[in-house]
């Protein structure tokens, strides 16, 4: 048990360069992909690993409907996406459409809140 604790301590104290070298050794000498090793180690250890693995890390903000104040939604979409006015209007007109794709949960929720406050119907996927 003491040997494992010492090994764990050494592992935690590795520098980025040493971790890179370790990954190379594992791949070349043992045929273990570093990502596969992390999944293999973490998988059986945690009972709720399946639920944690399914938790999304990137979200798409989808405009389902512009609502009554379409002009405000077009301006907000233009501001949030950096698109030109025509592109933002076309995006709002073609609802349901993805406003932003693959963004962090906090950013997606903030964007959703802004759009909903302006009167739009928004969904996170």
UniProtKB/Swiss-Prot annotation:
CDD domains: Ribosomal_L7_L12 (cd00387)
Pfam families (UniProt xref): Ribosomal_L12, Ribosomal_L12_N
Molecular function terms from GO: mRNA binding; structural constituent of ribosome
SUPFAM superfamilies per UniProt: ClpS-like (SSF54736), Ribosomal protein L7/12, oligomerisation (N-terminal) domain (SSF48300)
Domain of life, source organism: Bacteria
GO terms (BP aspect): translation
Keywords noted in UniProt: Ribonucleoprotein, Ribosomal protein
Keyword RNA-binding: no
InterPro entries: Ribosomal_bL12, Ribosomal_bL12_C, Ribosomal_bL12_C/ClpS-like, Ribosomal_bL12_oligo, Ribosomal_bL12_oligo_N_sf
Cellular component, GO, one term: cytosolic large ribosomal subunit
Family per similarity comment: Belongs to the bacterial ribosomal protein bL12 family.
Function: Forms part of the ribosomal stalk which helps the ribosome interact with GTP-bound translation factors. Is thus essential for accurate translation.
Subunit text: Homodimer. Part of the ribosomal stalk of the 50S ribosomal subunit. Forms a multimeric L10(L12)X complex, where L10 forms an elongated spine to which 2 to 4 L12 dimers bind in a sequential fashion. Binds GTP-bound translation factors.
NCBIfam families reported in the protein's UniProt record: L12 (TIGR00855)
Name used for this protein in its record: Large ribosomal subunit protein bL12
Taxonomy of the source species: Bacteria, Pseudomonadati, Bacteroidota, Bacteroidia, Bacteroidales
